[in-house]
Regions:
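Membrane-proximal helix-turn-helix segments that form the acceptor-binding/catalytic region
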Residues: 84-86, 105, 112, 136-156
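Short donor-sugar binding/catalytic loops of nucleotide-sugar-dependent glycosyltransferases
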Residues: 10-11, 210-214, 229, 244-245
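Donor nucleotide-sugar binding/catalytic pocket of nucleotide-sugar-dependent glycosyltransferases
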Residues: 151-191
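Conserved donor-binding/catalytic core segment of Leloir-type glycosyltransferases
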Residues: 198-217, 223-226, 238
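Glycosyltransferase donor-sugar binding loop
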Residues: 37-42, 183, 210, 237-250
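N-terminal strand-loop element at the rim of the active site
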Residues: 8-13, 25-74, 163-168, 178, ...
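A short, glycine/small-residue-rich beta-strand->loop->alpha-helix junction that serves as a flexible
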Residues: 6-21, 40-42, 100, 214-217
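An aromatic- and histidine-rich active-site surface loop
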Residues: 76-81, 94-121, 125-126
Length: 253
């Protein structure tokens, strides 16, 4: 295996568990290094296993509106420069951006140095969303940049079979790979003994949706199916937990 740098550009929403689960499959003996973009909650610092910390570089920047705007319009040059510096210091031969394909400008510099650049594609199409106008504008600009980077990327990986087929039809001349989605159910979750106060004394099992609450995820269909299926609602509770707004009427009983 060629010496590899895995780059995670965000721990936002589901990306935090996704990245940490992948990183934690490695051991210190593997010839792999990690550059992880953290926020105020120090998600990666907390969730990456200690024996890998010597292989990790944690990049931290406040998740402020100003930093978001600056990064959206100008890119994060400091972060890109850190990628290049780590490649030089560690003699990296492969860089894998696992949250999105690499920015075109960074990918070109790396390729000119003989470094293979791999990008994971998560969303070929932008998610449906209903947000404030300024957030919709930001999402549109981000999507435009993401599409540009995907179009440029020479080696792409995806965790979705349908998306892999679509990539094959869109980019017949690219190097494309499918890899099954890593489980986000960690050992800590499986063996956990702590309960939120709201769930500690329930009198029957529950079906849990946990994650950011957004319209495109079809939570309204999940709720409708649950309330209209006696086999479910008589023997289970439905628990919807996460940040966001539930955009449909519901029976709060």
């Amino acid at each position: 295996m060629k010496r590899t740098l895995i780059v995670a550009t965000t721990s936002y929403a589901g990306m935090g568990p996704y990245v940490s689960e992948i990183v934690n499959t490695f051991s210190p003996e593997d010839d792999v290094y990690f550059l992880l973009y953290d926020y105020e909650d120090n998600f990666f610092q907390i969730n990456i296993k200690n024996e890998l910390k010597s292989h990790c570089t944690f990049y931290k920047k406040a998740n402020s509106s100003w930093n978001k705007l600056k990064s959206m319009l100008l890119g994060d040059k400091e972060f890109s420069n850190l990628v290049l510096e780590l490649c030089r210091i560690k003699s990296i031969r492969v860089v894998h951006y696992i949250c999105d394909p690499a920015p075109c400008s960074t990918a070109k510099i790396l390729e000119n140095k003989g470094i293979r650049v791999v990008g994971t594609v998560h969303d070929l199409e932008a998610h449906e969303a209903k947000k404030a106008p300024h957030k919709m504008l930001r999402a549109w600009i981000s999507e435009k940049q993401r599409r540009k980077n995907t179009n440029y990327g020479k080696v792409l990986v995806t965790n979705g079979k349908a998306q892999y087929e679509k990539l094959l039809s869109m980019y017949p001349n690219k190097e494309l790979y499918y890899h099954s989605f890593p489980s986000l159910v960690t050992l800590e979750i499986e063996k956990g003994t702590e309960y939120p106060p709201e769930l500690a004394n329930l009198d029957k099992p529950y079906i849990l949706f946990f994650g950011r609450i957004e319209e495109y995820k079809g939570i309204s269909y999940l709720y409708e199916a649950f309330v209209n299926t006696p086999l479910l609602n008589e023997y289970y509770y439905l628990v919807i937990a996460g940040k966001g707004e539930i955009g449909f009427e519901r029976n709060k009983n």
